[in-house]
Amino acid sequence: VDFLSDKESGTIVLWENFDLIEKSSGNVYAELGKHQNATAEYLSLIFHRYLNGEGRNPLTIMVNNYKLTGLDPFLENHRKTNVRRKIEIPIKDSEGKERIVSVQPFVLPFQKDLSAEDKRLSGGIENYRAKQGFYIYRNKRLIIWGTWFGRHRDELTKYARIKVDIPNSLDDIWGIDIKKQHATIPAIIRNRLTK
């Protein structure tokens, strides 16, 4: 708690009493290390746009005094990333008010053109091709990634990642659950995205 004493604002998540981990593995610190790394990677992906300061001051997230840096699943600054034109799709919310869903495709570089840092930023080489597809953001927070929503993957899409930004006013249209971990793409959007 002292960590926040000199800060203007902040939140601390404190984990204590790891009796289940201790009983299951016997080595609490080794298991916590695995969970810590997985948690840091997850947060670095989910909140990457906030951590990188997109459109605002960068957010700071620390895991055991380690400051997280945002990943970049689109490798937007890589010289060989093909950044395609952003399109905006108007859609009416449940009250009939027009909202905008923005869509921007990226074609990522071939693996041979990636540095070790590029591989880390894109989410790891083991996920490089497996996690191609749509990346759905709700208010710049990543909620779904690496899915084609049932669309067949082919040679033309093997390096494609598509950023889709939706406002929170479309939660009900997208079927976003309370945990912000599930969404169902509306037919009007699916038809436009899969063209």
Where are these regions (language model features)?
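Bulky hydrophobic/aromatic packing residues
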Residues: 1-4, 8-10, 15-19, 70-77, ...
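GHKL-type ATPase core
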Residues: 1-63
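Serine/threonine-rich low-complexity intrinsically disordered regions
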Residues: 5, 14-17, 27, 72, ...
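Charged regulatory segments coupled to nucleotide-binding catalytic modules in large multidomain enzymes
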Residues: 22-24, 31, 35, 80-195
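Accessory nucleic acid-recognition modules appended to NTPase machines
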Residues: 44, 48-95
